[in-house]
Amino acid sequence: MKIIRIETSRIAVPLTKPFKTALRTVYTAESVIVRITYDSGAVGWGEAPPTLVITGDSMDSIESAIHHVLKPALLGKSLAGYEAILHDIQHLLTGNMSAKAAVEMALYDGWAQMCGLPLYQMLGGYRDTLETDYTVSVNSPEEMAADAENYLKQGFQTLKIKVGKDDIATDIARIQEIRKRVGSAVKLRLDANQGWRPKEAVTAIRKMEDAGLGIELVEQPVHKDDLAGLKKVTDATDTPIMADESVFTPRQAFEVLQTRSADLINIKLMKAGGISGAEKINAMAEACGVECMVGSMIETKLGITAAAHFAASKRNITRFDFDAPLMLKTDVFNGGITYSGSTISMPGKPGLGIIGAALLKGEKEQ
């Protein structure tokens, strides 16, 4: 099955409410959509959201990487030699992880369609349902508690709470108010998005431990490049610490695992450059006895479906952060994963299971 066409288009989908973290506020989910057509007539789909403050990718840079570098190298290639294709994607240019991830998605989609199996089964097939958390954006303690209570009513038993934007006293007040409103049975995991200094993180986490707030884990408490600070927080607290922005590549995962700087790793396809890099990170983590979560950027159901296929395939991936499509006003794609409250069911169709998209106003073909 040979690649005969690679196309991109742009989409923009409004969120139902602003998504706020310590790093940014998002009002609209923007993405570059990739479509690879094969000589069999099959179409593979991929998605790359621009996340400048995390991956450094913009809409223009994603399209440029795809059309000026990846597309010329891939046209005419056969999926029978997919290992060489994946190597080319990762080594033809540095960085540009979201562009690489989107092209890889469309290739894995085509590969699994060629084999006649859902992608998650091709990759390991460990499970066919997932339980996702729901993210509570940074706002006042009262508004965050109200949001948390609303998500609980929708069936979510695990909430991911954004912190790190203000002082630690305000963050602790947020968690106290949320815990009071949702009760003790709901899992609360925190994400500081690099918003604390190491000493602040240790102080905040210890205070929450002493208050009995029952925090499941704290994600990326300190700056992504401060592995010594991350390790300090990990060693000084009882609450499990998860590395997120500190781990893009397998090499960075190796450094975190070797130094035991974190207890857990959050893998995202947009950081890892696609499924091939994500598999390497998870394999190393599993060899070291470290469990992984798979999360995402603000993506449509297309990108989340690809991430869910990867996550569903692996035993060592034990936590899932796939709420982004639920934040959007419009479901752009047909097919893919389905939601029932917090439960995600994997599609049974070959490949990703995406069967088409409704073109949005202003979508631009390249």
UniProtKB/Swiss-Prot annotation:
What induces its synthesis? Repressed by AbrB, a transcription factor that negatively controls biofilm formation.
Keywords recorded for this protein, A-Z: Cell wall biogenesis/degradation, Isomerase, Magnesium, Metal-binding
Reported EC number(s) for this entry are 5.1.1.20
Positions that bind substrate: R24, T135, K160, S296, I298, D321, D323
Q: How is the cofactor bound?
A: Binds 1 Mg(2+) ion per subunit.
The cofactor required is: Mg(2+)
Kindly state the subunit structure of this protein.
Homooctamer; tetramer of dimers.
Question: Which EC class is this protein assigned?
Answer: isomerase
Q: Which residues bind Mg(2+)?
A: D191, E219, D244
In alphabetical order, the GO MF annotations are:
L-Ala-D/L-Glu epimerase activity; metal ion binding; racemase and epimerase activity
Q: Which InterPro entries match?
A: Dipeptide_epimerase, Enolase-like_C_sf, Enolase-like_N, Enolase_C-like, Mandelate_racemase_C, Mandelate_racemase_N_dom
The family classification in the record reads: Belongs to the mandelate racemase/muconate lactonizing enzyme family.
Q: List, from the UniProt record, the residues annotated as the active site of this protein.
A: K162, K268
What organism, scientifically named, is this protein from?
Bacillus subtilis (strain 168)
Cysteines joined through disulfide linkages: none
Catalytic reactions on record = L-alanyl-L-glutamate = L-alanyl-D-glutamate
Q: In which pathway does it act?
A: Cell wall degradation; peptidoglycan degradation
The answer to whether the entry has keyword Metal-binding is: yes
SUPFAM superfamilies linked to this entry: Enolase C-terminal domain-like, Enolase N-terminal domain-like
Q: What name is this protein filed under?
A: L-Ala-D/L-Glu epimerase
Q: Which SMART domains match?
A: MR_MLE (SM00922)
Q: What are the GO BP annotations of this UniProt entry?
A: cell wall macromolecule catabolic process; cell wall organization; peptide metabolic process
